[in-house]
């Protein structure tokens, strides 16, 4: 990757398995770019998951090529696909300012 000018990548929905693959490349001396993972959360994310994220973050703390120090929280969708919750209806398409299933990603009291 570095030989093509790609020096860093980031996955906003990284997984432990994916991080382990990059770690294997690092151990074999074949990782030629920086990799940053952000773990996604959901309504079923629990304390054990958060503890796992913390252990993994600490494992790679100070590593110059591998990072896993971010967690992605979803509120709704994105404007481009008309899944973001809006105050007013979309002017060009979509459903009346709601996500695809008509709800926020999580129940409002959890935000």
Enumerate the language-model features and the residues they cover.
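Glycine- and other small-residue-rich loops at beta-strand/loop junctions that grip anionic moieties
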Residues: 11
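Short acidic/polar active-site loop segments enriched in Thr and Asp
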Residues: 7-8
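Metal-coordinating catalytic core of metallo-dependent amide/deamination hydrolases
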Residues: 15-111
């Amino acid at each position: 990757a570095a030989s093509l000018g790609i020096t860093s990548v980031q996955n906003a929905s990284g997984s432990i398995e994916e991080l382990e693959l990059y770690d294997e490349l690092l151990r074999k001396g074949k990782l030629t770019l920086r990799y940053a993972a952000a773990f996604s959360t959901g309504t079923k994310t629990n304390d054990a998951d958060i503890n796992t994220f913390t252990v993994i973050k600490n494992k790679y703390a100070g590593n110059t090529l591998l990072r896993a120090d971010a967690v992605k929280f979803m509120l709704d969708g994105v404007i481009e696909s008309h899944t973001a919750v809006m105050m007013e209806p979309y002017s060009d398409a979509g459903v009346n300012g709601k996500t695809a299933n008509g709800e926020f990603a999580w129940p409002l009291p959890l935000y």
